[in-house]
């Protein structure tokens, strides 16, 4: 299978890329046509195997292999082989055991392969006298960085493992359990690397040529201040790790024949944990810096901490009840679904960490060893064992990160009701009427960490008509 996708239109754009899209936006709309076309080649093969051990016990196997190549023969090409094996064993007349293992590769999107240029807009002059409109001036320094194509980016590969039980119960009822675990150790994310640039600031004290009643001009040779600014290159890498696991239940309670209604009940508990293996770096907190840095949102160096210790955790327990009624005489099917989220948990965990290094404005990396923890870092980027008298400094232990704010959040129980009515129109097709969140349940509720009420279940209400035809 071969496919190609390309958008030749420009789309929504700025008429002048030298100007910010809006104040302090740090970005520009990107033309769709600036992104190369997407080429993909894929091939898939599978085979099924059945072994009838005896009249009761049967073993079924499904083996598959998928090959994918994106942007073949280019310097950003990615390829993958994704094998999978699914097994099912009939242990008794009423019990089937099934399991599977496989790899699933996700190709990077075009925004990852061909990142857009990065823009950083900083105010260079801000002179706004209220009584002299003609002299008012607002000027920006715009730093543009051409981000390189992601030549070393790999497919994000997920290892999927699952084990399930299928039970056949009296009355044509069925009960199924499924446990699963998926791990993606190389998901897409930022691969932090820095460059620095110099940004001049001009004020009425130095650099601005002010003539009352006339336009203010700038003497670019006489800035009031020059800042050295850190900026990331926008490089993308395989720096995200995700582990997703859980258990699912499906219970087919059979049919209530007098009213032609089937009852289906399901439940699921899931847990997702994500963390980054990217370099963990931060600016120095402004409270520890002199005003020459804190007032202008700059930092004398970047502080580096251990990676992979912070994570985001999400847990959820949900139940769904579905009723499906067939009305043969009217050639109609009505369905009603009730869903409740009993448990909704999230946590952004920040570990207790101490600095392990720092990056100075010349982009040199310096280690911070355990015996340096009681020392000081000067704004000149040098280490001091005691407080220096001739330069402002930051105590290294003050830059330790504490996890005191890592409090889990538990949201209150919410529920949702939806319905659908489908009508067949002979052999030509049919139509469906549907409504989601039919009770328009969007309550204001508080979470476990705050008494502030916030609206839940938002953007879930919708209704409409679907029309389909049989060709």
Role assignments for model-derived ranges:
Residues 1-74, 246-248:
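Face-selective signature of the C-terminal outer-membrane beta-barrel domain
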Residues 2, 43-49, 85-91, 163-167, ...:
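Residues on the lipid-exposed face of transmembrane beta-strands in outer-membrane beta-barrel proteins
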Residues 2-8, 65-73, 101-107, 116, ...:
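Transmembrane beta-strands of outer-membrane beta-barrel pores
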Residues 32-36, 105-184, 205-213, 227-255, ...:
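Outer-membrane beta-barrel signature, preferentially recognizing the C-terminal barrel domain
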Residues 37-43, 77-81, 157-161, 241-247, ...:
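Residues that define the transmembrane beta-barrel architecture of outer-membrane proteins
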Residues 54-61, 94-97, 171-175, 257-262, ...:
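Repeated loop/turn-to-beta-strand initiation elements of outer-membrane beta-barrel proteins
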Residues 200-353:
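Gram-negative outer-membrane beta-barrel transporters
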């Amino acid at each position: 299978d071969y496919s190609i996708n390309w958008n030749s239109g420009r789309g929504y754009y700025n008429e002048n890329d030298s100007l910010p899209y809006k104040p302090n936006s740090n970005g520009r709309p990107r033309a769709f046509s600036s992104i190369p076309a997407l080429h993909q080649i894929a091939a898939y093969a599978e085979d099924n195997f059945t072994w009838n051990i005896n009249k009761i016990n049967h073993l079924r196997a499904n083996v598959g292999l998928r090959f994918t190549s994106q942007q073949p023969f280019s310097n950003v090409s990615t390829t993958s082989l994704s094998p999978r094996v699914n097994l099912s064993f009939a242990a008794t007349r009423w019990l089937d055991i099934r399991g599977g293992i496989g790899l699933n590769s996700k190709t990077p999107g075009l925004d990852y392969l061909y990142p857009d240029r990065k823009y950083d807009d900083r105010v260079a002059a801000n002179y706004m006298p209220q009584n002299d409109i003609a002299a008012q001036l607002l000027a920006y320094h715009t730093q543009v960085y051409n981000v390189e194509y992601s030549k070393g980016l790999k497919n994000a590969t997920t290892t999927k493992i699952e084990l399930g039980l299928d039970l056949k119960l009296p009355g044509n009822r069925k009960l199924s359990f499924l446990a699963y675990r998926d791990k993606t150790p190389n998901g897409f994310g930022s691969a932090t690397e820095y460059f620095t640039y110099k940004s001049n600031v001009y004020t009425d004290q130095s650099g601005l040529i002010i003539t009352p009643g006339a336009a203010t001009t700038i003497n670019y040779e006489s800035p009031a201040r020059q800042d050295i600014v850190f900026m990331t290159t926008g490089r993308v890498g395989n720096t995200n790790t995700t582990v997703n696991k859980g258990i699912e239940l499906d219970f087919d309670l059979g049919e209530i024949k007098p009213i032609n209604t089937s009852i289906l009940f399901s439940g699921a508990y899931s847990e997702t944990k994500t963390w980054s293996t990217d370099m963990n770096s931060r600016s120095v907190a402004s409270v520890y810096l002199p005003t020459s840095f804190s007032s202008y949102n700059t930092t004398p160096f970047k502080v580096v901490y251990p990676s992979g210790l912070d994570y985001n955790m999400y847990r959820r327990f949900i139940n769904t009840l579905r009723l499906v009624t067939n009305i043969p005489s009217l050639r109609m099917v009505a369905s009603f679904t009730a869903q409740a989220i009993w448990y909704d948990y999230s946590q952004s965990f920040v570990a207790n960490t101490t600095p392990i290094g720092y990056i100075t404005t010349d982009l040199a990396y310096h280690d911070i060893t355990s015996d340096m923890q009681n020392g000081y870092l000067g704004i000149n980027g040098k280490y001091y064992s005691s407080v220096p008298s001739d330069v402002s400094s930051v105590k290294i232990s003050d830059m330790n990160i504490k996890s005191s704010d890592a409090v889990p959040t538990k949201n209150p129980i919410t529920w949702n009701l939806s319905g659908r009515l489908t009508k067949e129109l002979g052999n030509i097709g049919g139509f469906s009427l549907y409504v989601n969140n039919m009770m328009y349940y969007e309550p204001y509720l508080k979470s476990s960490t705050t008494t502030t009420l916030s609206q839940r279940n938002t953007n879930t209400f919708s209704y409409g008509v679907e029309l389909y035809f049989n060709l």
